[in-house]
């Protein structure tokens, strides 16, 4: 059935292959490392000569393919007939297309098998002939990564230890400050206790003194009592019964009551003194306690201030050390920069001196070349004068030449100031065996002039170098009738 003029697109899971034309099949495999081009007509593998399979990575492409669009180009005469045939015979068309698809799939499978065999062979050849480009550094990479991990862990551990050391130093500073505060407080308490002991000793001494005074007073009272009784007894014994005087007087004073009163007075005095002393002692103790509490509070405040000041001092010392290190680094950088720029300046100075020397040499060379150019211009003018002179001489001597066909040569020479050497040669050409009359027109004559230029370089009156250059020059003179 005729299927011209229709366009059919069929989806498949295999790569496309055109059965009627040349189509390149590109296969990609995840475990292969090369691309292989296979033509469907000849089934030949195209690889460059002298090159193996290169280990360049292959681009991965999904194994799902779309068969390309097949266009069947109809003839202009059969367009309507083809469209009618397709519309009327769809089943036959689909059957034909399915048969073609089956044959196409069989060819694709065959080509895939051949391509796989060729890839295996190429892989074997490449594995046999492929040189080792570079050693395997994977083990070293793993070792390097492990060492880098260890280095990072060590750095983290070092930073943690440094932070712990700093914290320990701060805690030690706090404990040292607390110890010093407690030590100063203990010293103050010991000083207060020593003062109180001294006060207690003074009070015990005053108490003992008062007790001694009371005892001495009681002893004195007893002595007075005994003396009084003795005096009374002695007076009674002296008087006896001789005098009996009745005296109406005031009743006698009871010494016991008086002594009792005195004792009560002294005891009250002692009690008042004791109370006064106790009150004074209590007031002193309260004042001392208040002073101790206030001093302890002030000391704690001072200790806190001291701790804060020490922390501030430590932070300032750290900052000062950092500033010192920064200053040292900046000084080193400045010194390096100065040294680098000094070296660069020296290089630039040397380059400037070299350029100045080159400029001076170029100027001297230009002056020398200018002088040589002037000399050469002078030589050129003289040579032109000489050439004109020789030309005039040749023209004047032309009438004197013989008429027979023979070759004559005339070589005049001239030397001017040992710098130029000219050798003109006059030649006239004639053929042997042919005689011409004198008045016949002959061939043109050629004059050979040799220009010898001697260049001498003179310095301080001495010839340094000398160069000689010989340049031939031909002058053509037309023949005269």
Swiss-Prot record:
Region described as Linker 1: spans on this chain: 126-136
Cross-referenced PROSITE patterns: IF_ROD_1, IF_ROD_2
Region of interest called Coil 1A, as start-end residue ranges on this chain: 91-125
Biological process terms in GO annotation: epithelial cell differentiation; intermediate filament organization; intermediate filament-based process
UniProt cross-references to InterPro entries, sorted A to Z: IF_conserved (IPR018039), IF_rod_dom (IPR039008), Keratin_I (IPR002957)
Keywords: Coiled coil, Intermediate filament, Keratin
Coiled coil residues, start to end: none
GO molecular function annotations of the record: structural constituent of cytoskeleton
Residue ranges, annotated region (Head): 1-90
Region annotation (Linker 12) ranges: 238-253
Region (Disordered): 1-25
Annotated region (Coil 1B), positions in chain: 137-237
Region ranges (Tail): 398-481
Site (Stutter): 339
Region Coil 2: start-end pairs: 254-397
One CC-aspect GO term: cytoskeleton
Domain (IF rod) ranges: 90-401
Comment field (misc): There are two types of cytoskeletal and microfibrillar keratin, I (acidic) and II (neutral to basic) (40-55 and 56-70 kDa, respectively).
Quaternary assembly: Heterotetramer of two type I and two type II keratins.
Role summary: May play a role in late hair differentiation.
Family listed: Belongs to the intermediate filament family.
UniProt protein name: Keratin, type I cytoskeletal 39
Organism: Rattus norvegicus (Rat)
Gene: Krt39
């Amino acid at each position: 059935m005729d299927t011209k003029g229709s366009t059919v697109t069929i989806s498949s899971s295999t790569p496309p292959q055109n059965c009627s034309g040349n189509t390149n099949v590109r296969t990609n495999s995840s475990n292969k490392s090369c691309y292989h081009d296979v033509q469907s007509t000849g089934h030949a593998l195209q690889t460059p000569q002298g090159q193996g399979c290169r280990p360049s990575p292959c681009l991965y492409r999904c194994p799902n393919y779309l068969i390309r669009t097949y266009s069947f180009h109809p003839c202009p005469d059969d367009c309507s007939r083809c469209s009618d045939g397709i519309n009327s015979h769809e089943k036959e068309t689909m059957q034909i297309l399915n048969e073609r698809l089956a044959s196409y799939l069989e060819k694709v499978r065959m080509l895939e098998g051949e391509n796989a065999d060729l890839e295996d062979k190429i892989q074997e050849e490449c594995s046999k002939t492929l040189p080792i480009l570079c050693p395997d550094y994977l083990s070293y990479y793993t070792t390097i990564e492990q060492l880098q991990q260890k280095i990072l862990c060590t750095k983290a551990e070092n930073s943690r230890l440094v932070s712990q050391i700093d914290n320990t130093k701060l805690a030690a500073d706090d404990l040292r400050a607390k110890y010093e505060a407690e030590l100063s407080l203990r010293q103050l308490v010991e000083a207060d206790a020593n003062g109180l002991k001294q006060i207690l000793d003074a009070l015990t001494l005053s108490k003992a003194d008062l007790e001694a005074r009371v005892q001495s007073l009681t002893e004195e009272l007893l002595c007075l009592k005994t003396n009084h009784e003795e005096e009374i007894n002695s007076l009674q014994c002296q008087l006896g019964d001789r005098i009996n005087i009745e005296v109406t007087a005031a009743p006698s004073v009871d010494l016991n009551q008086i002594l009792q009163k005195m004792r009560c007075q002294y005891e009250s005095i002692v009690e008042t003194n004791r109370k006064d002393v106790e009150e004074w002692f209590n007031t002193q103790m309260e004042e001392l306690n208040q002073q101790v509490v206030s001093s302890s509070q002030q000391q704690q405040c001072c200790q806190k201030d001291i701790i804060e000041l020490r922390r501030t001092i430590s932070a300032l010392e750290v900052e000062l050390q950092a500033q010192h290190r920064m200053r040292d680094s900046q000084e080193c950088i400045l010194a390096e920069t100065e040294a680098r720029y000094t070296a660069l300046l020296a290089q630039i100075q040397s380059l400037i001196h070299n350029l100045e020397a080159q400029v001076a040499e170029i100027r001297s060379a230009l002056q020398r070349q200018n002088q040589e150019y002037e000399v050469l211009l002078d030589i050129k003018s003289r040579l032109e004068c000489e050439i004109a002179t020789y030309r005039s001489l040749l023209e004047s001597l032309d009438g004197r030449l013989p008429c027979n066909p023979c070759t004559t040569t005339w070589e005049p020479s001239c030397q001017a100031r040992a710098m130029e050497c000219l050798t003109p040669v006059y030649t006239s050409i004639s053929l042997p065996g042919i005689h011409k009359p004198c008045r016949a027109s002959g061939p043109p004559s050629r004059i050979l002039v040799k220009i010898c230029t001697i260049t001498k370089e003179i310095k301080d009156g001495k010839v340094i170098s000398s160069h000689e250059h010989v340049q031939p020059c031909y002058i053509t003179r037309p023949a005269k009738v």
